[in-house]
């Protein structure tokens, strides 16, 4: 299967077999790193990392993955990038494409990363946009594969919370593409767009995936092996929306009771992080003082329980991002 020089913009661009090939390569690279026998396949390559949104996991994953594989990288922080401000996306793409072997972009509009890919002449990787988070999806799929004990097409998972943005969109597409039993539990006003839902149903017709969207969180999690969530207020949204969002989503909080509603004593909890699960951050303390919530989308009890596999998930960001880069650029 040829993934050489491929852009990695959204899972809709790939077949189930191609997505599985990325997962297989990630598992192979992970094993090699842990065994101390990793072979550098990207020596002499240069990668530009464009971040219009700040990042911990995505940046670190790209940096470490590139370094492990012998590639050099340039980090363009939010304040340093001229993209779309003093220089058009098209021009930025053509400049960086002359200097670098690949470009990673983390920012706002999906259209921006698509335009970079159109004009760069080198592979472009989507580190996150408002609409999609494809590298996170590979990490999530690898993590579920490691913990499931059965093939992904025999695995059920649910996403509960605000499903309008990149995580809800991407998990719905991931499940559809890989033939999984995927459920979205959210108020209907916070479901993915009609276009995303239609794309998921189209993929499911090809793969045999089962898709459920429901406003009942308990119905969504019944029988699943994994429960995913994300923050209720996204980066850049004003503090004023917190009360409205808490009122809307209070029944979708991942509590021990919701975990138990799965009926599966082995159910696992997943979160792309960062998570508001206690008062140990400035935002977490502000939420507690303002709304009386110790933990928002997930309780501390669930987050810190043996069911929580969020740090396996976070580690797998690096291995799966490495797989994307090696597949595109590796010798």
Curated annotation (Swiss-Prot):
Belongs to the aspartate/ornithine carbamoyltransferase superfamily. OTCase family. PANTHER family: ORNITHINE CARBAMOYLTRANSFERASE, ORNITHINE CARBAMOYLTRANSFERASE, MITOCHONDRIAL. The keyword Zinc-finger does not apply. Its EC number is 2.1.3.3. It comes from Neisseria gonorrhoeae. Its main location: cytoplasm. This is Ornithine carbamoyltransferase. Pfam families: OTCace, OTCace_N. It comes from the Bacteria. One of its GO terms (cellular component) is cytoplasm. Pathway: Amino-acid biosynthesis; L-arginine biosynthesis; L-arginine from L-ornithine and carbamoyl phosphate: step 1/3. GO terms for molecular function: amino acid binding; ornithine carbamoyltransferase activity. Carbamoyl phosphate binds at residues 55-58, 82, 106, 133-136, 272-273, 317. L-ornithine binds at residues 166, 230, 234-235.
């Amino acid at each position: 299967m040829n993934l050489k020089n491929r852009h990695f913009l959204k899972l809709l661009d790939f077949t189930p077999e191609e997505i599985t090939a990325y997962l297989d390569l990630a598992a192979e690279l992970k094993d090699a790193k842990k065994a101390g026998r990793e072979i550098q396949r990207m020596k002499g390559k240069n990668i530009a990392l464009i971040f219009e949104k700040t990042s911990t996991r995505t940046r670190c994953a790209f940096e470490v993955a590139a370094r492990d594989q012998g590639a050099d990288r340039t980090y363009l922080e939010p304040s340093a990038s001229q993209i779309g401000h003093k220089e058009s996306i098209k021009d930025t793409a053509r400049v960086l494409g002359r200097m670098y072997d690949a470009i990673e972009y983390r920012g706002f509009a999906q259209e921006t990363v698509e335009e970079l890919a159109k004009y760069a002449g080198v592979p472009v990787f989507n580190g996150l946009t408002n609409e999609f988070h494809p590298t996170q999806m590979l990490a999530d799929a690898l993590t579920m594969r490691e913990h499931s004990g059965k093939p992904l097409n025999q695995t059920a998972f649910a996403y509960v919370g605000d499903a309008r943005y990149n995580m809800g969109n991407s998990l719905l597409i991931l499940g559809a593409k890989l033939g999984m039993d995927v459920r979205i539990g959210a108020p209907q006003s916070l479901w993915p767009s009609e276009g995303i839902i239609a794309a998921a149903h189209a993929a499911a017709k090809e793969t045999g995936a089962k898709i459920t969207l429901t406003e009942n969180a308990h119905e969504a999690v019944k029988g699943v092996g994994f429960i995913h969530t994300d923050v209720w207020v996204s980066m850049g949204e004003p503090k004023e929306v917190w009360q409205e969002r808490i009122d809307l989503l209070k029944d979708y909080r991942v509590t021990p009771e919701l975990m138990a509603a799965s009926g599966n004593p082995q159910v696992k909890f997943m979160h792309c992080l960062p998570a508001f699960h206690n008062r140990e951050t400035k935002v977490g303390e502000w939420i507690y003082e303002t709304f009386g919530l110790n933990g928002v989308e997930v309780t501390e009890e669930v987050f810190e329980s043996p069911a929580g596999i969020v740090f396996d998930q976070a580690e797998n960001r690096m291995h799966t991002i490495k797989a994307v880069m090696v597949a595109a650029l590796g010798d």
